Amino acid sequence: MISGELKPDQGVVMLLDRRVNHLSEIARVHRGCIRSFQVSSIIGSMTVFENILLAVKQKRSILKMLFRKFQSISSESSFVYQILNQLSLKTMETKVASTLSHGDKRKLELAMALAMGPKILLLDEPFAGLDQAESSKLIELLKSIKKIMPIFLIEHDMQAVFALADKISVLNEGEIIESGSVEKIRKSKLVQNAYLGGDL
């Protein structure tokens, strides 16, 4: 609902302290609400650099607040290089996206989302299909990003959620069954019974 894909039956949707019920999905993107979907948005025939550049051109606005250490951004290309460096993708810039490992494709999707200048980042199952090593790297990357902007994370990997979240809401069959801190969710019998049938 926060992205505008679904409309609420009642109540108010707030985005960065502003009511956005009346705004379209595109309008919310321009307000800085950027989504990364479980289904890849990468164009496989394009290089890593080209995919990120395309995302920059889609947004057509560069937010310096993403990378505070840089004083100025002279062009779209230089912004792409900043993102490549930030996400440790510089050595892969000329690689065709279809040849990347699953973990590197997830990083590229994240880079493309960041290239659109988000003020809030919505991530849908970013850990899907990752092995333990890839998940660990992505967790550390997202920890650094959450220092810059809020992240809304939809994820079934509870260990990743516990490593990243400040507040968790757990859904079961479309209903919120528990909400609170990591510690509260770990101890919740409702969550344990719904998902694992035992301790988290």
Model regions and ranges:
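Glycine-rich phosphate-binding loops of nucleotide-dependent enzymes
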Residues: 1-200
